[in-house]
Each structure stands twice: as C-alpha cells, then as structure tokens.
Amino acid sequence: MNKILITGSSRGIGFELTRQILRKDHFVFATCRTPDSAHELKLLHNQYPNRLTILKLNVEDEESVQSCFKQMEQDGESIDTLFNNAGIIDWSNLEQIEAIALEKIYKVNLLGALLVTRHSIPVLQGSDSPLIVNLSSRLGSIELRGGTKLGGAIAYQCSKAALNMLTKQTSIDLEPYNIRVISQSPGWVKTEMGGNEAKYETTEAVTMMLDSLEKLPQDKTGIFIGEDGKEIPW
C-alpha cells in the first residue's frame, strides 16, 4: 500500500485523484484550504476512515505548508507520491490581464508547488521510490504554443511554463535524495477550470493519468508527459 499526498483535493481533478487512488487500496493524505467545508471529502472519509486523512494546507501560505509537513514528520509519516495539483486559471489575454491576477496565478500555480515540494522533502525521503507529479498543461508547452498560435489565458500559460521549469530544475536538485519529479498534463478536462466543452470527463482523465503513472519506468525523471503517458515537448 502506497501513501499519496494530493494538494487541492476538495474538488475537480484533485478530488477524483483522491477517490480513484483510495479505490486502489492506497492511503491518501488529501489536503485543502478549508477542510471544514470540504463536504465531498468528508463523505469520502466516511467510506474510507482508515485510509483517508484530510489535512489543512494552503499552498499560498508558507507557514501553512511548513506546519502541515512538520506535523507529518513529527508523526513519523512518509509519502510515496506527491501530486502538486492545486491550481487556478484566468482566461484573460494580453490586453485584459491585470497585474494582481497574474501575481495570484503565479503564487498558486508556481510558488505553491515550490513551497510544497521544498517542505515535503523529509517525508518523501521515507519512501523507497518517492515521486513528485506536478500537474501541468499543454498550454504551458512553449513548443506547442508556437505550433498552434492559440491566444488567451496568458497568465495561466506562463505559470505552467514556469512550473515545467520547476519540474526540470527540481528533478536535478532532488536527485541526491533519489526523489523523481515529473510534469503531467491531465488533458482538457470538464472541471470548473476546464469548462463544459472540454474533451474528457474528470473520471476518464484521472483513470488515464494513473494508468500511465503506473507504467512509468523507475528511472524516468525531469520529463513532461500527457494523460496517456506520452512525452510532451517543453
């Protein structure tokens, strides 16, 4: 049985990751900003009281992040896989985006992942094969943007491109700890962020993601893959 920690787990892809991983008989630390109002997570906890722990963690607040992992470390906990899933989107284009909105997106999508990664190192070291999965997007691929020339969501696209660099750099920085780091795009998913026109239902996207991660070779790190496991250009 593996131990998995997921940020932003109260809804969308994070919640579905939690649900499907529990069905695979693993243990899940489901984190979110306000556990008291995470009603769906609470219902899930009623189903899996011995394998689901709900933790308070606000990726925008370093004290919150540090406190969460410090408590886990003191409790002797470890995690095998970390999903940096928490994220937000703004569809504004170059002429529309406001500075405060761009700062907010970077704080959640990039800084949040950095803080969680940094403070999770001690509990990841308790695993024989620790893995960090940063939830990215094809919208963060510089090469693909050049091919399609799609506009809009400029802050989100930039934040995911930056997240991919975080993946690459931390895969190097964490190599001495034997911690692997990858980026994975879930595809275009029907969530609050993705909208109703998206390609995948949440259940389908997460099933594909988890299947591809189970097949990921143990020596793979510092790569960007899709929901199908195929590599995506940076």
Protein language model features and the residues they cover:
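A short helix-coil junction within the Rossmann-fold of NAD(P)-dependent oxidoreductases
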Residues: 24, 75-76, 92-93, 119-128, ...
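N-terminal Rossmann NAD(P)H-binding glycine-rich loop of SDR-like oxidoreductase domains
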Residues: 10, 14-19
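Catalytic loop of short-chain dehydrogenase/reductase
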Residues: 88, 95, 99-103, 125, ...
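Conserved glycine-rich Rossmann-like NAD(P)H-binding loop of the short-chain dehydrogenase/reductase
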Residues: 24-40
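Active-site Tyr-X3-Lys motif and surrounding loop/helix of classical short-chain dehydrogenase/reductase
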Residues: 67-71, 92-96, 100-107
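C-terminal helical subdomain
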Residues: 176, 183-184, 195-234
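The beta1-alpha1 cofactor-binding region of Rossmann-like NAD(H)/NADP(H)-dependent oxidoreductases
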Residues: 56-67, 99
